[in-house]
Amino acid sequence: KLKDVDMQLQRNKVTNLRLACARLDGLLLRPGETMSYWYLIGKPTAGKGYLPGMILRNGGYLAATGGGLCQLSNLIYWMTLHTPLTVVERHRHGYDVFPDANRTQPFGSGATCFYPYLDLMIRNDTQDTYQMRVRVGKTDLEGEWRVSAEPTERYAVVERNHEMRAQYWGGYIRHNELYRQTFDLQGNLLAETLVAVNDAVMMYSPYLEESKKEG
């Protein structure tokens, strides 16, 4: 739950996610093909059943039809980083809105979306066919990539060079780099590839937790 956010918008988000998942679940991405998040989902309109949900804009919250679909693009991006698939287009928010409390993934590991300008596009440069499975579970948004051949490698995402940089105007920029590590099935590191460089204006005190402890 998010502080100061209308919980009806959160409930509406679940409806929006179910509609979008229905458009993506079962997608086959064959060798040489590229998928576009927005091409597959289409414009999220009230006529299609989408409801007002929360979106982030310029570091703040507002309600918009189809709001909440960034949660799905975040999941798909994170899933894809754990495969050999190629991310062709990905964007992230220019603002870091949430402190790290309860964070389970590195900062900057999501993919924001805004129809029709900010898309998430993924290309299959392998010789195998991939299938996307996504759904709204009982408590979580769930997803996986399935592949037509037995996997010969596994993947992990690690964070490097994480910094909170003070700026001349009094605020902070949060920076990090994400790398995809490729291992063979015996656990030997085969490669480490840069996949994202993130910079975002922080919308909270970078020393929030320390301040609370001192208080």
Residue ranges and their predicted role:
Residues 1-215:
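Well-ordered beta-sheet/strand-loop patches within structured domains
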